[in-house]
């Protein structure tokens, strides 16, 4: 049912007002904002294109991460002079003028370690800093050490980090949690948002917005002081996601904001650039060329925006699951993103109240309530009985069930009866022997069946627990942990994703080989171990038999997590 006409303008006016207040509060920092670093494809122009197209390296990310040894303009000038000379060797030119990223030493864990001991031993192995960042490096400097995912991912990633931080907190490493929150706050202050990762070529997009949840996690240890300290950065990130809303008319979209015909405001994923991704240059060009019926720039934008979603790639964004060139991320309103935006608004309300600004707290509560109504109206498929994404082209909720449907439960935005239906749908369609399936579609893309990802296992587990669905939550945790344990027993490592159709097998598909390490798997595994085992009898390995719900911890524990006065 539509809202009464007189109240709508008043509600919508709150959002621009909030955004302007957020910017006003932070305007003192504007003069300190440095010039945005340019990505390597812009700095190096035709040289970058030629190197990537020559496929000098098996992974396109290698040259994107390479550091110029001198001014890129001088290197480019030298290249233009030399490239047509007889005997010119492109690989030699690259080796002379660039420092390539070093391959990390393969970590060999000590013999006889339990799963918990292995993870605790990995935190220092995965910790990095940017103390030695050079002027032309694509790596963006950060003030504090940080934990990377592992493998080819040599930098910090936005949404990965939240699930890594859950594990750091579980291990009692609150200093590392605080460092990572400080780093992300620094990025917001410096660039106006948190980029996909701390690389210049990631600056044109963000990722699922977990910063407010990171601050909330830190507040478990530091109390409301953390909420008050990082309120300005949370406000500034919210302004980034809502940028352009004040000029939107009904039925329009601007960057990351969507205004539906009835005035409902929701968000979508978006990348400010519409060119091939430097880290996947050749692959993106090939994808665009394979569909001549669409402008290449449109495909590039949708590829980049899918990377912003964290789900790169998935049938979720595609008209034809077998053809990546049919993806249209920017015309889809994602249920997980809008759940996170709801949670951001709720945490902003809490932080504003802690800071003594009740008027602002009430504004954020109003925004959260309006978004919750939008989620229930547009992102619920009543015919199927599950949450789903909204299609801006068909003006209908989509039919596909994905693990993203659990996000409204995770942030407590779901109606009770709908949460119960989600539990049934999850158990019927997504639960597999090795954990929760990402989707039920086999497309060959990594964010589809049969792959299961640690963050989605945790979101589902927590979300179902929030609504009393503890048996299904235990099933997910137990099946996924068994998969992790079996893989660890055989290979002595934790990996980025798992094949959930069985147990003990890493996942496949996507643009690169399976990566090990792995930050968010480590974090979620620790949280789940402490969830399924009683507090008085913590387990260091996954029990051989499924624990009963009564014997398990009723709420996830976090070491030393009591708020400090």
UniProtKB/Swiss-Prot annotation:
Stored SUPFAM superfamilies: Six-hairpin glycosidases
Region (Disordered): 538-565
Catalytic residues as annotated in Swiss-Prot or TrEMBL: 312 (proton donor/acceptor), 496 (proton donor/acceptor)
InterPro entries listed in its UniProt record: 6-hairpin_glycosidase_sf, 6hp_glycosidase-like_sf, Glyco_hydro_37, Glyco_hydro_37_CS, Trehalase_periplasmic
Gene3D superfamilies the UniProt entry points to: 1.50.10.10
Gene Ontology MF terms: alpha,alpha-trehalase activity
Enzyme class, spelled out: hydrolase
Residues engaged in binding substrate: 152, 159-160, 196, 205-207, 277-279, 310, 511
Keyword Hydrolase in record: yes
Cellular location(s): Periplasm
One of the GO biological process terms: trehalose catabolic process
Signal peptide residues on this chain, from the entry's feature table: 1-30
Keywords, ordered alphabetically: Glycosidase, Hydrolase, Periplasm, Signal
PROSITE patterns: TREHALASE_1, TREHALASE_2
UniProt-listed Enzyme Commission number(s): 3.2.1.28
Nucleotide-binding among keywords: no
Superkingdom, taxonomy of origin: Bacteria
Catalytic activity of the protein: alpha,alpha-trehalose + H2O = alpha-D-glucose + beta-D-glucose
Polar residues composition bias: residue spans: 548-565
Pfam name, any one: Trehalase
GO cellular component: periplasmic space
Family indicated by similarity: Belongs to the glycosyl hydrolase 37 family.
Record note on quaternary structure: Monomer.
Function, in words: Provides the cells with the ability to utilize trehalose at high osmolarity by splitting it into glucose molecules that can subsequently be taken up by the phosphotransferase-mediated uptake system.
Matching HAMAP family: Peripl_trehalase
Protein's UniProt name: Periplasmic trehalase
